[in-house]
Curated annotation (Swiss-Prot):
This is RNA-binding protein Hfq. SUPFAM superfamilies: Sm-like ribonucleoproteins. GO terms for cellular component: cytosol. GO terms for molecular function: RNA binding. The gene is hfq. RNA chaperone that binds small regulatory RNA (sRNAs) and mRNAs to facilitate mRNA translational regulation in response to envelope stress, environmental stress and changes in metabolite concentrations. Also binds with high specificity to tRNAs. Keywords: RNA-binding, Stress response. One of its GO terms (biological process) is regulation of DNA-templated transcription. Homohexamer.
Amino acid sequence: MKNTVLNLQDLFLNNARKERIPVTIYLVNGVQVKGLVKGFDSYIILIEGDNRQQNMIYKHAVSTIQPGKYINLTNQNQNNNNNNNR
């Protein structure tokens, strides 16, 4: 059996990416960046905005991420646990 650490950050961003949910990212300097999450890793979030403009945002500069609609992490977490128990 494999033990995995629950990482809400990754669940949230991955769900927003897969479901193509628009997000507004508020940076610590007050700037807002709006768009779709195209990818992320431990250090950055790649956002595609209007007119396919790409923004690479360092996570240490992020204050808040607000999704355009509710992201249900409960079902995602249950699915991951079910897959890990097989």
